[in-house]
Amino acid sequence: MSEASNTLSNMLTHADIRLLEFEDTHPRRTGLKNDAILHRLGMSPARYYQRLDQLVRQQAVQDRWPRLADRIGRQNERRRQERAQLQRWL
């Protein structure tokens, strides 16, 4: 294991790494993905996405999974913009 990987492992729990690896290989939100989150990771989809959002803000995660972090960041920004648009209409 490289020094960078070892440092990353020390900063993240095994469950965090499993979650990030799962998201990296399952990027689309579907009912099947939600079922897999429940059965493979043992958490609710809501908690999964909360934790994913927390993790991708960490520099170590951005360094190890840059495409994943960028994708999640873009999705979050798009949702923020959509909510802001809705607020203007209310």
Where are the regions a protein language model picked out?
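Short, Lys/Arg-enriched anionic-surface-contact patches
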Residues: 3-18
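Intrinsically disordered, low-complexity basic tails/linkers immediately adjacent to helix-turn-helix/homeobox/MYB/SANT
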Residues: 67-90
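Intrinsic-disorder signal
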Residues: 1-4, 90
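Amphipathic, hydrophobic secondary-structure cores in small proteins
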Residues: 18-74
